[in-house]
């Protein structure tokens, strides 16, 4: 079966007063993630309605690449460094494109 491009939305919510630290930790993921095999795009957004909410918008060549990404040291370290700084856990949504331009 051919690889299917996968889009991922990953959402984290910082505890009140922790958004600057969480923002820094999120930004630290950008460069190493973009250099990974299979990464097409890896961008970070911050909610304009709630500055404690950060969303990664990612495109990968396959779900296998995403799974490998989540096991990388920089992802594991992110989880450790943000421990106690987030409301709940990271929410990850896997998407497939169903419309064209």
Model regions and ranges:
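Residues at secondary-structure transition points
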Residues: 1, 13, 17-20, 51, ...
